[in-house]
């Protein structure tokens, strides 16, 4: 009954936090032998973490940098790098999202910021409007893979792994996804007879590189300090905010004090929504733990088959399905504790497992029917969800191929953390 409450509320389009919270509250109140005071205590304790402070600060840093005009600088640099290739602006969209990912770990922020600029340009270059939107939607999902990644932070806290190691684990898959998307953009360009209208110029590249340096320095400050042992990810996030304010006020001079209340409000809302979802998902996850659901899932799956390859495929299928239906933060908090016993039985490294989980869930961002970036894309690109769904499936297939590579070639995710000593 308590699970049915969440399912019914989701079917009626209720916010995911309300669905999870109502289900957990019903269990605490009427089903389980649990003191009701445990519910608010669980909500508070689940987000009362110094590490979790990194999330609102990274969101704020990304919003500040976007308001400072660095998005246009990164797009200009991307044009100078790959604009001369066939299907150039498709490649530019991918590269720009990869750059933007280093200052904002949010796919939604990347989709809105890059998409609003690139979709009209892609149309002018000869891409169909729905195709242009699909490229921007799919490439925006590189954001949560490349550090600093908000989903990786949530997974690290939930599974008890190193945030620094998880950041590194997502970097190589993010680059691979970018390259795969660029190959598909080349195919689309040849199919639609889109020719390169720009020529590569080292002088222009150098000029745009210098112009973009203020944005490119930010990930160096964040990641250099973390891996150099100078500060924690949370401290890195606060330094990123300070740097973004300095850049916006004194370097680009596009950030005005009158903009600050709206930026702070938007960042607070985005952070609060995520934290509320995490808190409610934790309350529900603890019920699942009390009922020994994680052990039951592991036992049932291993009883179904002992073949590791089949189990990993089933795991990917489950995560992809969940990613299509649920908020990423809620999915991580709810399902990671349930799946950890199975991961341990399969002998998976927790960093590798974390990359598997987050990448499958990220693919759900642009997978019909309810991928969150699909709806951001329809708003930014001014297309219907039906038009976007028709062109998005090849991108979903590319994402699934990446998930399988990450699953069955652990070195893709573990090579960089191992090299850095994690």
Model-flagged regions — what are they?
Residues 1-422:
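Alpha-helical transmembrane segments of multi-pass membrane transport proteins
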């Amino acid at each position: 009954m308590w699970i049915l409450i969440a399912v019914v509320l989701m079917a009626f389009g209720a916010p995911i936090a309300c669905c999870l919270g109502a289900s957990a509250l019903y269990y605490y109140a009427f089903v389980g032998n649990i003191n009701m005071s445990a519910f608010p205590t669980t909500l508070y304790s689940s987000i009362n973490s110094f590490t979790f402070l990194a999330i609102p600060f990274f969101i704020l840093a990304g919003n500040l940098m976007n308001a400072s005009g660095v998005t246009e600088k990164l797009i200009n640099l991307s044009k100078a790098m790959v604009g001369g290739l066939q299907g150039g602006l498709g490649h530019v969209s991918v590269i720009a999202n990869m750059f933007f990912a280093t200052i904002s770990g949010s796919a939604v922020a990347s989709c809105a910021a890059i998409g609003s600029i690139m979709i009209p340009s892609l149309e002018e270059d000869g891409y169909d409007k729905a195709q242009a939107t699909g490229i921007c939607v799919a490439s925006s999902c590189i954001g949560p893979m490349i550090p600093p990644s908000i989903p990786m932070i949530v997974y690290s806290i939930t599974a008890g792994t190193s945030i620094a190691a998880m950041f590194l684990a997502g970097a190589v898959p993010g680059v691979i996804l970018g390259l795969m998307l660029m190959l598909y953009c080349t195919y689309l360009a040849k199919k639609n007879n889109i020719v390169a209208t720009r020529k590569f110029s080292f002088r222009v590249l150098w000029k745009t590189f210098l112009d973009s340096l203020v944005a490119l320095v930010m990930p160096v400050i964040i990641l250099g300090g973390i891996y150099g042992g100078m500060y924690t990810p949370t401290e890195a996030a606060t330094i990123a905010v300070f740097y973004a304010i300095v850049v916006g006020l004194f370097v680009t001079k596009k950030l005005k004090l009158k903009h600050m209340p709206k930026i702070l409000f938007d960042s607070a809302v985005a952070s609060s929504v995520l934290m509320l979802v995490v808190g409610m998902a934790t309350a529900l996850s603890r019920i699942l733990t009390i009922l020994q659901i994680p052990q039951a899932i592991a036992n049932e799956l291993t009883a179904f088959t002992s073949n590791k390859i089949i189990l990993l495929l089933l795991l990917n299928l489950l995560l992809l399905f969940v990613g299509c239906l649920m908020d990423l933060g809620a999915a991580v908090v709810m399902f990671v504790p349930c799946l950890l016993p199975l991961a341990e039985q399969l002998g998976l490294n927790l960093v590798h497992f974390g990359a598997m989980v987050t990448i499958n869930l990220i693919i759900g961002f642009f997978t019909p029917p309810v991928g969150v970036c699909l709806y951001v894309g329809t708003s930014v690109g001014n297309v219907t969800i039906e038009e976007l769904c028709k062109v998005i499936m090849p991108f979903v297939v590319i994402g699934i191929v990446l998930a399988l590579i990450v699953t069955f070639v652990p070195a893709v995710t573990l090579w960089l953390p191992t090299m850095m000593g994690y």
